[in-house]
Amino acid sequence: NGTQSNAYRLSQKGGLNVITLPKTIDNDVAMTDICFGFDTAKSIATEAIDRLHTTATSHHRIIALELMGHSAGWLALGAGIAGGADVILIPEIHYDIHAIAEFLNNRRQSGKRFSIIAVAEGATAVGSVPDSGEEASGGKKTGKKKAEKKADPKIVTSGSQQEPVMIREPMVNRIVRELQALTGVEARMTQLGHVQRGGTPTSTDRLLCTRL
């Protein structure tokens, strides 16, 4: 988002002729079919889901993997489908935790003793408030209280003077905690973090960059 926005500002206010390339693992640059970097990140995330199947199966757990994607769910969606995730949560569609719990319980009753959930970091529950300072529709927050916050705020101390600092718990932590309570099944979470942003590019990304 920042690269394309700043390029636009330079062209409009700086009087410069600017050419930008669609580079982002989120694959969310408007008017493009695919952004380079996306396929590489998707491959890394897919491999992570493949590996999580082993421990989820052997320990009969629910495992949620948080992937990048604050406002776009392409990465979680693509990796989730390719890796065989049982549930995929993306920012574009608010999730219902009770519906998810019911689905997971039905899986166990049918003999499936584990479940994998791919979660985009920007996924939110029904009735939650985006934390970007804007409503989901793109407008400014009205200041009205909503039924649910995006994440649970906690107070911690930091620095030599022990000043209070407000931090927010990742939504994936809350998802795992609620699902464990609703299903009675041990649930764990893992965050792939910046691992998905690096590494050797896939052949698809190399070809795309060469063509560009």
Per-region residue spans from a language model:
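Accessory alpha-helical/coil subdomains and C-terminal extensions
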Residues: 7-9, 14, 38-59, 63-185
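Acidic/polar active-site rim loop that often engages polyanionic ligands
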Residues: 21-34, 57-58, 82-83
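Short, ordered loop/turn segments at secondary-structure junctions
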Residues: 1-3, 21-28, 92-95, 121-124, ...
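Short glycine- and Lys/Arg-enriched binding-loop motifs that mark or flank ligand-binding interfaces
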Residues: 22, 33, 65, 69, ...
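Gly/Ser-rich helix-loop-strand patches that form or flank binding pockets
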Residues: 17
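Short beta-strand elements at the ligand-binding edges of bilobed clamshell
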Residues: 31-42, 199-206
